Amino acid sequence: MPSVDTASAILSSLDALGVTHVLYCPGSRSAPFAYALEAGSFGGDARPILDERGAGFAAVGLARTGALPASVVTSGTAVAELAPAVLEASHARLPLLVLSADRPGELRGVGASQATDQSGFFGTHVRASIDLEPQE
């Protein structure tokens, strides 16, 4: 399953870069991250959180303690639920990494279910926004 391999590679990279916590919000688009976490692709603390807003603010709290957290959410409106936490982290100059499992680019803007263009969604409140295309 290529998407699980990609999620594993991303999580392993986060681990190597010093990310300490992954707060995972379950969803069908982000399921490969759940499988990769279960397989041990991330060596830090990983925990499921059902509400994206809760995950965002839990990540902000962890960042305030000196941790380097990441929140993983699914597609559609889930990323919008992180906006208050992203703005809080931005204003407080706290590290917060957001991974959103969006639909492929060709499904955006054509009426596909749960396809919200997430690239650049947080505007100037983030240091970078990267859109990875799916791998074959």
Tell where the protein language model's regions lie, with residue ranges.
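N-terminal alpha/beta PP-like core and its mobile active-site loop of ThDP/TPP-dependent enzymes
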Residues: P2-E136
